[in-house]
Every structure is written in C-alpha cells, then in structure tokens.
C-alpha cells in the first residue's frame, strides 16, 4: 500500500506494520482532545497528526514500541505543518513516564507536562486476543494483545491520565464487552459509546469508546453508518472527516 495523502499532511507507511485504515481515521476524527494528548500505539503517526490538526493549541506525544514505525512516524511529523507540536517516542506503554500521583496536575499544558500526564489519551489498540498469529512478527505485535493486554493498557492510562482527562479508543465489536469490563476493573467509567456500521443493514462492526475516572453526565450512546444506500460516504462520515479527506 502506498502513501496516504490528507488535506494538510501525508502519511508514508512502507516501513510500518499497520497501515492507514478506517479505524485510525475514525478515532482521529472523533476522539476528545485536550491541552496535552497521548497517542498509544502511534504507528504511522496518523492519529497523532489528526489530533494536532483538530486541536491547534495541543501538544501531542505518540508512543510505539516498533522502532521502524517510530522512525517513519517522525518523518511524517517533520514533513507536516505540526512538527513543532508532535513528538514520537519509541517505548512500551509500560515503560513510559508519569506516576499515579502526578494525575492530580493542574489542567494547563505546562502543569500537565511538568507532571508527565495528559488530559486526553487516544489508542487504536491491539485487539486479537485468541486468534492465529501472523507470520510477520511486527504485524502480529501491532494487532495482538500479547504486546499490550487490555489490562496493561488501562493501567497505563490510569497512571498517565489527569483526573479530569478522557481516554478514547476504537475496538472491534467482538471484543467491546471485554474491553469495557477491563476498564471497570481499573476504576474507569464509560462516558461515550459510538457503534459504527459499514452499511445500514449491518450490525456495528466497531465501537468508539470514551472513558473517564469519574461519572460524567449525560452518558452518550449512538450508532452511525459509514456508507449510504448508494455506496457513498454517509452524511455523518463526510462531516467528521471533512477536515482531512480531499
């Protein structure tokens, strides 16, 4: 798969195990932002760049354990208009800085950075739990929960998310119940849920979810459709992606 050009930036992806896909585009267009944003499993840098574009004052940090992906993501960032506000770090979430005590930081970019925490975290996480491994070890690492179990993901988010922050993720329908259950065990509350259908007659194939450390009202839940009956992008899909697609 070749390069992927958006309105304000371009994604080179020949050295990345996971290419630009619908899930990343949806999450980058939907997730809640903040002053300081963390993208867990940043891959090509797509979601990091989308968040930087949507939130012009935000500082964005993307982390990934694949050195090749991080190298290419840095190149994508440097070729973008957002190079001064996006940083790519090569490390595991489990080894990334911040402490649980730091989550009480003031809700300013300076206060959050000083404490090593974020007021918005996003992730398109590994989701294959019990399926056959791909012979490509890097693609396996990017897609299977072996490299980042859901519980480890939520433990990292709990450590790095400010008290008033929001964590947003996208997962396939078949693991959404397990994902939400793991969040509850770590003390998170589901505050927003969006099921996404490919076409109207189908069941949702994926869910976008937002979590907080305390209950937020009103709770939002809805289902959207990506394609209309003519096979074109739906009004909803066009609206949330219009800043990005040419």
Can you describe what each PLM-predicted range is?
Residues 125-152:
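Mobile active-site "lid"/loop adjacent to the S-adenosyl-L-methionine
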Residues 12, 61, 87-89, 191-194:
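General small-molecule cofactor/ligand-binding pocket signal
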Residues 2-36, 42-55, 210:
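SAM-dependent Rossmann-like transferase core, predominantly class I methyltransferases
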Residues 29-101, 111-134:
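Conserved SAM/SAH cofactor-binding pocket of Class I
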Residues 201-246:
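SAM/dcSAM-binding transferase cores
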Residues 27, 124, 153, 211:
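Residue-level signal for inorganic ion chemistry
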Residues 8, 57, 83-85, 164, ...:
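A generic structural signal for alpha->beta connector loops
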Residues 16, 148-204:
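Conserved Class I SAM-dependent methyltransferase catalytic core
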């Amino acid at each position: 798969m070749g390069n992927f050009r958006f309105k304000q930036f371009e994604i080179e992806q020949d050295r990345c195990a996971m290419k630009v896909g619908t899930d990343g585009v949806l999450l980058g267009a939907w997730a809640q932002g903040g002053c300081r944003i963390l993208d867990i499993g940043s891959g090509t840098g797509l979601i990091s760049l989308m968040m930087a574009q949507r939130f012009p004052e935000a500082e964005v940090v993307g982390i990934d354990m694949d050195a090749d992906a991080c190298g290419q993501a840095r190149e994508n960032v440097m070729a973008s208009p957002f190079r001064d506000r996006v940083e790519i770090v090569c490390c595991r979430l489990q080894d990334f800085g911040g402490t649980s005590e730091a989550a009480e930081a003031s809700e300013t970019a300076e206060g959050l950075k000083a404490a090593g925490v974020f007021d918005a975290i996003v992730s398109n996480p590994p989701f294959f739990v019990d399926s056959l491994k791909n012979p490509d070890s890097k693609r396996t690492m990017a897609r299977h929960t072996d490299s980042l179990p859901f519980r480890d993901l939520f433990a990292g988010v709990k450590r790095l998310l400010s008290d008033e922050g929001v964590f947003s993720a996208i997962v396939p329908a078949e693991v959404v119940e397990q994902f939400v259950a793991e969040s509850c065990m770590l003390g998170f509350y589901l505050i927003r849920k969006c099921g996404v259908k490919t076409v109207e007659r189908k069941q949702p194939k994926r869910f976008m979810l937002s979590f907080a450390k305390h209950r937020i009202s009103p709770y939002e839940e809805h289902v959207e459709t990506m394609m209309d009956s003519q096979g074109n992008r739906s009004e909803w899909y066009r609206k949330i992606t219009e800043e990005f697609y040419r």
